[in-house]
């Protein structure tokens, strides 16, 4: 994105985003969180504070590889993790000999790009529960989410996955959100276009 740039975070902003993560994901006390995000990128989407606030366990990897991820899930009882769609694809396309049958669902938050509906469908069949968010470095990571509507539960799998690839409902802790025309700086219609 051009020359290196920096963003200064405030403690208050990081705190608000951490609370937003908890609320958005409806996270319970004592989660077991697997780190596949770099903590230096948007402060790990503020999950160092999110997990710690819930008295959770942080599970760290030396390398983000499918085998290591699946072993950590089994060995530590991972309940939550985050990862870009490329991590989802890595898990879906892992050799069968490293893919365990998950004993319980693993909640996975994804961002960085819109995940392909086929990847969402495939990874959910493996036992992952996907939530899609969008954010920017300037807003501490996640800022908007695909807020799931219960009526989507009965849709065909492909259509459900297509809906899950969307996002756009602001985090509760965000002051506001608007999408503007860059030339006029006026709000664009909220019509999904």
Q: What role is predicted for each listed range?
A:
Residues 176, 191-193:
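AMP-binding/adenylate-forming core of the ANL superfamily
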Residues 6-8, 35, 57-63, 131:
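Short beta-strand->loop structural element characteristic of the AMP-binding/adenylate-forming
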Residues 1-16:
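Conserved AMP-binding A3 loop
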């Amino acid at each position: 994105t051009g020359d290196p740039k920096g963003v200064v975070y405030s403690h208050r902003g990081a705190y608000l985003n951490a609370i937003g993560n908890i609320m958005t994901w409806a996270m319970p006390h004592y989660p077991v969180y697997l780190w596949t995000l770099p903590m230096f990128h948007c402060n790990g989407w503020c999950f160092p504070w999110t997990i710690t606030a819930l008295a959770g366990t942080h599970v760290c990897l030396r390398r983000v590889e499918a085998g290591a991820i699946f072993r950590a899930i089994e060995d530590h009882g991972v309940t939550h993790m985050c990862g870009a769609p490329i991590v989802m694809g890595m898990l879906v396309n892992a050799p069968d000999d490293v893919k365990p049958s998950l004993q319980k669902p693993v909640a996975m938050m994804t961002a960085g790009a819109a995940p392909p509906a086929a990847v969402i469908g495939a990874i959910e069949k493996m036992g992952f529960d996907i939530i899609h968010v969008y954010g920017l470095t300037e807003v501490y990571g996640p800022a908007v989410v695909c807020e799931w509507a219960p009526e989507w539960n009965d849709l065909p799998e492909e259509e459900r996955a297509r809906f899950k690839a969307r996002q756009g409902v602001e985090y509760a802790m965000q002051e506001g959100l608007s999408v503007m025309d860059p030339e006029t700086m006026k709000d664009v219609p909220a019509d999904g276009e």
